[in-house]
Structure formats: C-alpha cells, structure tokens
Regions:
Chain A
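Basic, helix-initiating cap at the start of DNA-binding domains
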Residues: 1-26, 30-35, 39
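N-terminal intrinsically disordered/low-complexity leader segments
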Residues: 1-10, 74, 201-220
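Short amphipathic alpha-helical segment with a characteristic S/N-K-E followed by hydrophobic residues
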Residues: 15, 30, 53-58, 69
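Short hydrophobic/aromatic patch on the recognition helix
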Residues: 40-51
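Amphipathic alpha-helical linker/stalk segments
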Residues: 61-87, 106-109, 119, 130-143
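Amphipathic alpha-helical packing segments from all-alpha helical-bundle domains
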Residues: 74, 118-144, 153-157, 164, ...
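Hydrophobic alpha-helical connector segments
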Residues: 74-103, 155-159, 203, 220
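Amphipathic C-terminal alpha-helical segment
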Residues: 96-100, 136, 140, 159-178, ...
Length: 220, 220
DNA sequence: TTATTTTATGAACAATGTTCAGTATTTTTA
DNA sequence: TAAAAATACTGAACATTGTTCATAAAATAA
C-alpha cells in the first residue's frame, strides 16, 4: 500500500521535472505531452495515468517555481543593506527571474488555469508572489519606522501592479527598449511609489531618502 | 487595376469583420481559420489568398479595436467635469472596455505577435493606448496647472503600468474579487499616484484634491 | 506456474494551422 | 461570341497537439 504511493509520486516527479526543465529551457510553446513524455522517458499516453490533463501537470509546476523565485531573490539580495535598498533589490531580482524565464511568467500570469484542482491556492501564490518575496523587508521597514504600517498595504499593491504591468509589456514585447532600460524604469517607478509615502508630512523630509540612493544605481 | 484593389480590400474586410465579431462575442479561443471563414462566407483556404496567416489577420484587428476603445472612453466620460475627475473616469472606462472584451485584452497584451508585419506600429498603439485615450485630459490638467509638466510623464507611466498590472490579474483570474472591488482598487491606486504629485510642495496642499472627490465615488 | 490486477503503450480521433492541386469563375483575346 | 488565359475559390491532405481507448507488458497474487 505504501510502496505504491511512493512509486506513484516518484513517477509523477519525473513528469513534473521534465515539464519544469522544458518550460525553463524551451519556453511554454514547447511544453506539450509528447515532449514532456520524451524527457520523462515514457509514452505520452502514460502521462494520463498520473495527471488528469496537461493543464494539471503544468500548473503543479507553479509551487516549485515560486520556491525557485523566492530563493533567487534571497540569493541576490542577501548582501544588500537592509531596508529600502534591499527592498528595491528584491523587486529587481523578482523581475530578473521572470526575464530569465519568460515561460514561467506566462504560466504564472497569462495561461488559462482551466479546471486546475486548487486554482485557489495557486492563484494566491501567484498574485502575491512579489509581496511574499519581499515580505521580510516590508516587515523590516515597518518595524524600523521607515514605512508607516497604515500605508504599507497600499504601497505593496502599487508596486505589485506597476511591476507586473511593466513586466508584462516587456516580456510580451509590447515595448522595444533593452533590458537596461527596463531596469531603469523599474527603479524610477519603484522610487516614485516609495517616495510618495515618506513619513514626516513634508516632501523630501521623510526617512526613505529614495532620491539619494537613486544616484548610485548602476544597471548590471 | 483600381477595381481589383477595391474588391480585394472589400473581401479582406469581410474576413476582418468576421474575426472582430468572433473575438468580441466568443473570445480569442474561438478565433480560428474555420470559424472566421464560416462567418465571412468563404472556405478556410480562401483566407490564405488574402492574409499571410491567421496571426496577420488577428493583429490587423488591433487598429480597429483601439479606435473602438477610444470611442468607448470618449462616450463614457464626456459628461464628466474636465480635469482629474474626467481623467479618472477615462481610466475606468478604459478598464471597463477590456473587462467587457477580455479577448481584446489578450490580443493587445498577451498574444505572441509572431511575424506580424508592422509589429512596431501595433505595439506602439497597444502600449500607449491608455496614455492616448487620456491624452486630452493629461493636456488639460497640465494647461490648467493641475499637474506639473515635468511630472506628467512619470505619472502616466505609473498609471499605465499599475492599471495594466491590475487588469491582467483580474482578467486572467489571478484574483477572485468581484468587479466592484476591481473598480475600487483601481480608484485607490489611481488616486494614490495622482496624490503623490500634487503641486505646491506640501502634502494635501496641492490643486489635485483627489481625496475630496474620492468620497463621492460610487461604483456602478 | 497460472490467474489477476496494474501499468505502459501505440493507434486513433478531434481540433487547428497550413499547403496545394484541381475546379469554378471571371476576364481577356481572337 | 467562343476559346483561352488569368484569377478566385475550394476540399483534400498533411502536420501538430490534446485526449481516449483497447490491448500489450509487467507486476502481483493464487
């Protein structure tokens, strides 16, 4: 009884890994039952013994990919000074992750979820992925009084939507500027959002001091 | 020589109209050569005498749809008071247009443009569509001193990206809130962006007075 | 070992994009 | 007007992809 379970999970894992590899290396347009099964070392028909349909399989990748995204952000920001600087670096690392794997962006934000079993959990992870990968830093900024707790939810959603909108235009090639320009615009808009909420009441009088740090930004 | 041209354009028009009708009524997933040709009254093979491929045909719709979007916004905002109020109403009307026709949103922002002939012009129209439908109002606000000319480009891009990000999440069902909540969040974020740029130097001291008008907002 | 259950598979079907050779229609020419 | 030529239209056919199903292969139980 238990062995059966283990073996089934193992084979599901082969298909899952094949799908993830394919999506990352060839993009979403190469993800189809025959290619997946080839990589997994099975016939395409076997896939249907383990997954309801290809949609089910593909959206299962979301959980793993979110984890990879989280780790990518952590590794690329750990040497940054805590606070606004690391927050900004986290947002950039998040963007970089999807620029590196446009197929994952399509999967996360554009692909029709169809009848995926737990749509709810997946969409929750997806839509708050940026918030989540920045969570520690949001908390840090609030705890240090860099950001005000009443404002932080609005700021989060501003940054979430502005970042995703910009990313969508870039990844789907609705804009033609190069990567460096993407990052410049990302910083500009991130700073504008953070700036608008500097505590203390007066313009430029708060503790965020986004402008100063802006000067030293250099795109990779 | 001239008649041939006219006739060819006429038949292209039948296919184009069929595609537009189909996209608006059934969505992008029903847009295929056989359905289009059925509606146009021709065989699916005939389509290839007039268009390179289906992608070419579908992206030709962008120009017409942009015009419809523009008109939709104009008609739904003409009774609004000029300035920030009409600006906000324009943004909402823009969002409403895509909520009504999600297939057009997919076409504009998500579909792979492939080898579409003038990618350049189409993507320009697409990515600046929100800016364009609000152009008169942006100009009005600047001319009346409601917004400062140096800030307006940054504000435009903030609103553009934040609006598209929110719309993407909503239309692709990555969030589960109802339409009324979408509009609430749209207003909240629009106001936050506009507020951050009130002229005069001090918080709440500028001429935008977004807060006051926020009170009277009622979602349809 | 033999019977039964489980697992894996290719054949086959449906939907869609595309090409092409042949048919129908229109236009040109004699 | 009638034959010839050019043009327009079409279904058959092929490729790709998702899915189902009968059956072969393998594992398990008797």
């Amino acid at each position: 009884m238990k062995n059966k379970e283990i073996q089934e999970q193992r084979i599901k894992g082969y298909f899952l890994q094949a799908t993830k590899d394919l999506l990352k290396s060839e993009g979403l347009q190469s993800v189809n039952v025959r290619n997946i099964a080839d990589r997994a070392g099975y016939s395409y028909a076997t896939l249907y013994n383990y997954f309801k349909d290809i949609n089910d399989l593909v959206f299962l990748c979301v959980y793993d990919f979110y984890g990879e995204c989280e780790q990518h952000v952590r590794e690329h920001t750990k040497r940054q000074e805590r606070g606004i600087k690391r927050l900004r670096a986290s947002i950039r690392a998040y963007v970089d992750f999807f620029v590196q794997y446009p197929g994952i962006f399509s999967l996360f934000f554009m692909e029709n979820l169809g009848s995926f079993k737990d749509k709810g959990r997946a969409t929750e992870i997806i839509s708050f992925s940026l918030d989540k990968v920045c969570e520690e830093e949001w908390n840090y900024c609030v705890s240090k009084g860099i950001l005000q707790v009443e404002q932080v939810e609005l700021i989060k959603s501003q940054i979430r939507h502005a970042t995703l909108g910009l990313l969508m235009l870039y990844i789907n090639q609705r804009v033609s500027f190069p990567y460096t320009e993407l990052i410049n615009r990302l910083y500009l808009q991130t700073n504008a959002i953070l700036e608008s909420c500097s505590p203390g009441g007066g313009r430029d009088g708060g503790g965020v001091s986004v402008h100063n740090s802006l000067i030293s930004i250099k795109v990779k």
